[in-house]
Structure formats: structure tokens, C-alpha cells
């Protein structure tokens, strides 16, 4: 079993920055990422093959500089690509498996310190028809469009959050027919957030936001505010979508339904942190009502409740790549100070600029999360036959029956229905099961989360045998 001073899980902006900083200081580092290239979702090698905004161009420049700095010290870093982490033992030993089918010899790595920077995934709310071919997540469709792949002819965007604007502009610039943008946030919500948003955002993001809106207006794309997608129709694939106006609590208003002929729908409600590894490691988590998701508790130096385990990037809270870069630097400097690789006074001095930036980034993230956080009324669009857990094909009726039979909590629902036992390990259905149970029981109890289990992701039996 190989041993290093610092293990970094996740090779996005936070992980790359942390590895670069720690290696520059002189610590022995292992950097692990599931993908064949470093960079994560934003700075990955897919790039952007279409004409973009000023923001897209700046992202390319930042990515280039990030990788240039990393490559200067890469020979000092043990890099494991196409490698996933499926277990963390004794809070220091990381179990690995190859995602590319290769026969890699290293199954475990032990580290004195651990930085978890595995990013985030999209928040999805089920609706009738969401399993039809032609329904995409906002991020999933954006990845295709950036590669100049248009999987349809008439597109509709639905949900809430800033990713909508980004995808809308990529679709427009790729020459797609964007039929409409359906945004759950009301004009009142957006107006109320305007001043604090402007105060917390840098000029580049502000300029890009206005550029996006101008581009949408210039192409006469209709925007339906205070609306959600309520249903998708189709025999074998998406043929049309139904949208409906909502009130302040996102309850659908009957009689306001409108059908739009489309063959592709992208929707989502922002991002939520990936917490499976921090939960598996025993780190304390809290549910942040203002943000609408579980997050790991940590101190200013990004150390969790488990000494020696740090977290950075969107795996903490959603703030974007600039914040992820700053957090990777903070976590690495603190870890290296604890390893006696850098004097405490020097680490404290180097930390300050990043910590000051993070205060502003955090305010920006809080505002974006508040705008995109789903309100309770949206769950009224679910019908009995709506699929809640896609992996195990568990429907709303299955959940209703389990609660009627006495299911007491989310883990009881999981045992009775297999909800959350599929390939994604409850990453999507786990987002909504609390709300569904509360609606069925009429009792809003303490929010719960699925008990973390190993392996956190499906692994081959051969890998387990190798352990």
C-alpha cells in the first residue's frame, strides 16, 4: 500500500489548485480523479466548440493557467486518472478501482491528510414524463452543445438558476431553435436579489450575465417567469411539454397550463454538493434550509469535524470555479502547515487573500442557491405513476404504499421499495424523498439522509476480491 502525506480526491479546479500548492511546498501528494483528464466539469477537455461569451473566453484562460501551474510540479505528484474512490477506511486509507477497465496494481493509498473536492451534481425534481428520451439535465445538454452536438430540433429550458442562462446562450450560438425559457423564479425574487447580487459578484460575471440576457432578448426567446414544467408528452420520445404558472410557494395554478411543441427539454434547479465521501468518513453534516441541501460542517481553513480531513470546491457549497480555486489553496496550505511543511505564520499570511475572496464568493453562492431552491408546492405536479427513483423504477405510488404500510423514515422507504439502491446510489431520489414523506404523513419531522454505505459507487467484484 502506497503512503503519501496528502491525498486529494477530485481533479477539478479545487483539486488541481490544492495539488499544485502542496507539491510546490514540498509535500508528497496523490491526486485521484475518475475521468481521463483533469479539470472537472468546467475546465475539462471538452472545451467549448461554439462561439461563446467573454466569460467563456476568460474560463479558457484560467483553465490554461491552472494547468500550466500544475504541469510545472506534476512530476512531484502521483496522479491517478480513470480512478474512482469507493471506500475510505479509518478516515485515512482510500480504496480505489479503475473506471477504464484496466488492471491497475494500486488498490489502496494511505494519507496523513485528506482533501475531498469531488464537486457537485444537478438538483432534479421528478415530473410526469421526465424519463422520456429527449429530457436532459441542464448540465448534460450543455456538455453536448459545447461539443456541437444538438440532440433535437426544438428546445425548451425549464427550472431555475444561472445555468439556464449559460445553456440558453450556448444553444443560441450553436444555431439551435430555442422555443422558450421557463423559469420558476419570479420577477419579484430576482429584483429582491439584484442589489445584494451586484454587491457580491465580480465585474466579469456581471458583464457576462447582461451579455446573456441581451443575447436572449435579441433572438426574441420568450421567458415564462413564475412557471414550471408540469408534464412532458410523447409516445417514444418527447413531443410536447406542458408548463404552468406557479404561486409564491410554487404551487401550480390551475387554468394557466400551456402546451409547447418541442422535442428536447433541459431542466434543473441548480447544483448540490456531492457529500457521499465526507459522510462515509464520518464528517458532520447539516441541512442548510436557505440553500436547500446537505453540506459538510467545517472551519474557516476548510477542515471538517474529522481532524485532518478537508473539503474544498462545490462539494462544500455552490459558489463556482473561482471560489473552488481559492478553497483548494486554503485547504492545501492548512494541511501543509499541519504536516510541518510550511511554517504556521507563513501559511497564515498566504491564506489571507483567498479567505477575503471567499467571503464575497460565499454571499454570491447563497443568493444563487436561494433563487434556485425548489419550494414545496412544486411536488404537487407528481402523479401516482411518476417515477421517483429512475434506477429502480420506483413510482410515487410505491412511496405512497410504503408510507401507508408504516414506513417510518427514509431508510425504511429504501428497504421497502429499493428507492436509492440503484446505480446512482440515491443521489437524485434522495434529494426529494423527505419532502414526499412529509406531504404524505402531514408531519414535517427532522430531515434525514440515506445512511452512507460502502461501496459508494458500483464496483466490479474483481476489485472487491483484490481488496
Task: Please report, for each region that a protein language model flagged, where it lies by residue.
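Residues forming the flavin
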Residues: 1-467
Amino acid at each position: 500500500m502506497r503512503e503519501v502525506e496528502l491525498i486529494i480526491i477530485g481533479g477539478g479546479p479545487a483539486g488541481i489548485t490544492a495539488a499544485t500548492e502542496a507539491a510546490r511546498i514540498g509535500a508528497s501528494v496523490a491526486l485521484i480523479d475518475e475521468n481521463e483528464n483533469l479539470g472537472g466539469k468546467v475546465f475539462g477537455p471538452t472545451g467549448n466548440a461554439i462561439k461563446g461569451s467573454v466569460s467563456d473566453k476568460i474560463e479558457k484562460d484560467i483553465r490554461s493557467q491552472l494547468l500550466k501551474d500544475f504541469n510545472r510540479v506534476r512530476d512531484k505528484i502521483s496522479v491517478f486518472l480513470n480512478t474512482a474512490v469507493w471506500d475510505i477506511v479509518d478516515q485515512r486509507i482510500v480504496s480505489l478501482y479503475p473506471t477504464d477497465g484496466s488492471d491497475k496494481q494500486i488498490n489502496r493509498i494511505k494519507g496523513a491528510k485528506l482533501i475531498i473536492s469531488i464537486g457537485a451534481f444537478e438538483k432534479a425534481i421528478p415530473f410526469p414524463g421526465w424519463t422520456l428520451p429527449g429530457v436532459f439535465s441542464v448540465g448534460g445538454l450543455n456538455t453536448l452543445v459545447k461539443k456541437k452536438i444538438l440532440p433535437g430540433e426544438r428546445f425548451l429550458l425549464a427550472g431555475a438558476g444561472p445555468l439556464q442562462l449559460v445553456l440558453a446562450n450556448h444553444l443560441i450560438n450553436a444555431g439551435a431553435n430555442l422555443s422558450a425559457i421557463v423559469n420558476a423564479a419570479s420577477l419579484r425574487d430576482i429584483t429582491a436579489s439584484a442589489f445584494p447580487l451586484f454587491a457580491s459578484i465580480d465585474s466579469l460575471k456581471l458583464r457576462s450575465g447582461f451579455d446573456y440576457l441581451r443575447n436572449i432578448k435579441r433572438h426574441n426567446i420568450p421567458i415564462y417567469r413564475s412557471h414550471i414544467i408540469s408534464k412532458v408528452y410523447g409516445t417514444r420520445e418527447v413531443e410536447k411539454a406542458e408548463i404552468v404558472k406557479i404561486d409564491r410557494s410554487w404551487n401550480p395554478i390551475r387554468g394557466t397550463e400551456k402546451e409547447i411543441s418541442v422535442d428536447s427539454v433541459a431542466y434543473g434547479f441548480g447544483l448540490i454538493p456531492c457529500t457521499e465521501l465526507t459522510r462515509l468518513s464520518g464528517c458532520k453534516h447539516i441541512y442548510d434550509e436557505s440553500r436547500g441541501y446537505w453540506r459538510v460542517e467545517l472551519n474557516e481553513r476548510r477542515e471538517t469535524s474529522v481532524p485532518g480531513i478537508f473539503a474544498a470546491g462545490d462539494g462544500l457549497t455552490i459558489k463556482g470555479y473561482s471560489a473552488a480555486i481559492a478553497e483548494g489553496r486554503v485547504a492545501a496550505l492548512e494541511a501543509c502547515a499541519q504536516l510541518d511543511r510550511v511554517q504556521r505564520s507563513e501559511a497564515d499570511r498566504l491564506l489571507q487573500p483567498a479567505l477575503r475572496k471567499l467571503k464575497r464568493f460565499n454571499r454570491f453562492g447563497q443568493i444563487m442557491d436561494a433563487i434556485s431552491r425548489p419550494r414545496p408546492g412544486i411536488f404537487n405536479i407528481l402523479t401516482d405513476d411518476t417515477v421517483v427513483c429512475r434506477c429502480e423504477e420506483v413510482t410515487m405510488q410505491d412511496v405512497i404504499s410504503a408510507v401507508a404500510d408504516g414506513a417510518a423514515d427514509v431508510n425504511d422507504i429504501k428497504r421497502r421499495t429499493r428507492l436509492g439502491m440503484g446505480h446512482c446510489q440515491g443521489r437524485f431520489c434522495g434529494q426529494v424523498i423527505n419532502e414526499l414523506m412529509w406531504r404524505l404523513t402531514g408531519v414535517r419531522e427532522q430531515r434525514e439522509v440515506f445512511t452512507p454505505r460502502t461501496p459508494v459507487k458500483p464496483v466490479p467484484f474483481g476489485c472487491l476480491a483484490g481488496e
